Amino acid sequence: MEIEKALGEVAETPAKWSRNGGTKNHNFLKKRIKPGTIRHLEYDLLDVEIGESWPIPVSVVHGSRPGPVVTLLGAVHGDELVGPLALTYLCGANFMGDDRLIDPSVLAGTIRIVPIVNLPGYRRRSRYFPDRRDLNRSFPGNPDSNTTSRVASGVWKN
């Protein structure tokens, strides 16, 4: 009975997804991504003056129509190799077949694709960050804490 009642109700589309208002630019890492475009950016996992900042690639597919924002993360554990492969394939030219990319002109919403989050772990084929902490257990993180927690905080906020 409850299921039938729920099926009878019409869910409204959130106002921010309304197609009447048009799509606005998507802001990510202080960059503006125009509707109907794909941008490839680099994100520094750490804000450091000395040492490596661990830059990782981020692809943003911003649809021409309003919709949700979805972030896909791979290699949160550096020893898990299927996620980076799948997300790299998703960004590739043959994902839609016949040398076709994802078409942002027909997409509603935004997809942010990050094939490798745990870059140091991925390079060493290790689940953990160099400080022996598990990134997956560190979210939402703390910008004033250990390395893993700082990275988790940056990924969470962006």
Which residue ranges define each predicted feature?
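Structured catalytic-domain cores with a bias toward divalent-metal coordination
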Residues: 1-158
